[in-house]
Amino acid sequence: MSAKSNQRGAKAPLLGSKIKLNIEKLAIGGAGVARHEGMVVFVPQAAPNEEILAEITLVKKNFMEARVVEILTASPHRREPPCPVAHTCGGCNWQHITEEEQRRQKHTLVLETIKKFNRDLEFNYLPIQPSPRVLRYRNRIQPKFKNGRFGFFARNSHQIVETMDCLITEETLTDKFAEVKAWAEKKNAKDLQRLEMYIAEEGDVRYGLITDEDDGIGFSQVNRFQNEDLLRTALDWAGDGPYKKVYDLYAGAGNFTFPLAAKYAGSEIIGVELNPKLVERARSKITDKRMTYFMSDVETYMRRASIGKDDLVVLDPPRAGASEYTMQTLAAAQPRKIIYISCHPVSLARDLNWFFAQTQKLGIKYKLDRVQTFEMFPQTDHVETIAELRVDS
């Protein structure tokens, strides 16, 4: 592959060439960030504040990717991963970094991302909420089975890293790995890559295949220990009310819906969720006539919703975030308060930008009151964030 030029006109290194890099920080996606002759270089499995010898693996117009060949000066935040397969398994990309530094990097990443989309946005940015567990916290996983091999996909590959344990998974699940492997072998299939294991609400372990017709249990919080703290914060930030209606958008099986119904006894509670199995599960638990669950994608629902100024809106979208239409419609509806829970900093920052662009256009005064990150996924770059938006009176 021929060398390409970067924006400053200097030639980028050839593919496969080796260069020295100083890792400045970590990026969304988990890679270390360095600069070489004005060009950004992303290096997986690097750690902040270390010097490495790296091999260029990808050259693009505005950035490069590289792999660590040798650590010349180790980061003070680098450690030996607690998991023996962490260097090859694709499940955890930050096990080589201390937990304290993981939290610091996530906290910084969210702030930088929000400011990148809207540098004028002012808000109270609270310290990150650590997870009660940094290991053994996942209650839902998707192990892989292929040609007698049981484990997880290797990083950036469909090759299976064999393991009969996973240090970020609750032992209630990992204790069943041998049973699940034996079950997979009995199915006499060469390739069972769409397995799912989870701890049910009743406390028992369930497992099976995910099919095109059945996409598993759908979205649910995988860290029940941290989810309790997130719920408490969301309910606290929502305030005392009273609200005429309380909307839970992207409601899942009711993680927020039912606690909201318990807190706001005089409000009409509306959940909106697209996944039919999650809607069915939520509806089966409803005993209060004030509660209604709609099976719909949120944007379609917003086209007929009657959200008012005396209402509370809670939304917890997937990684892709909400749509521009949804955020603009929310802004125009002017609910008294909005609690936004996000699992991806970029979609959060983009959605906030859409929202405040619309309020400015309509002459509506809203305030981003406070933002806090939650360490929902230790040992990975993923982070949960909660934001409170309210009418600025």
UniProtKB/Swiss-Prot annotation:
Q: Which residues are the active-site ones?
A: C343 (nucleophile)
Q: Does the keyword 4Fe-4S apply?
A: yes
Q: Which residues form the TRAM domain?
A: 12-70
Molecular function (GO) terms for this protein are: 4 iron, 4 sulfur cluster binding; metal ion binding; rRNA (uridine-C5-)-methyltransferase activity
Q: What would be one Pfam family of this protein? A: tRNA_U5-meth_tr
Looking up PROSITE patterns in the UniProt record yields:
SAM_MT_RNA_M5U, TRAM, TRMA_1
- Enumerate the InterPro entries for this protein: MeTrfase_TrmA_AS, NA-bd_OB-fold, SAM-dependent_MTases_sf, TRAM_dom, U5_MeTrfase_fam
GO BP terms: namely:
rRNA base methylation
- UniProt-listed CDD domains: AdoMet_MTases
In which residues is [4Fe-4S] cluster bound?
Answer: C83, C89, C92, C166
What EC number(s) does the entry state?
2.1.1.-
Task: Name the positions where S-adenosyl-L-methionine binds.
Answer: Q221, Y250, E273, D316
Keywords in alphabetical order, please.
4Fe-4S, Iron, Iron-sulfur, Metal-binding, Methyltransferase, S-adenosyl-L-methionine, Transferase
Specify the enzyme's EC class, one word: transferase
Per the record's keyword annotation, is Methyltransferase included, yes or no? Answer: yes
Q: Which family does it belong to?
A: Belongs to the class I-like SAM-binding methyltransferase superfamily. RNA M5U methyltransferase family.
Quote the protein name from its UniProt record.
Uncharacterized RNA methyltransferase Bd3828
Q: Which organism is it from?
A: Bdellovibrio bacteriovorus (strain ATCC 15356 / DSM 50701 / NCIMB 9529 / HD100)
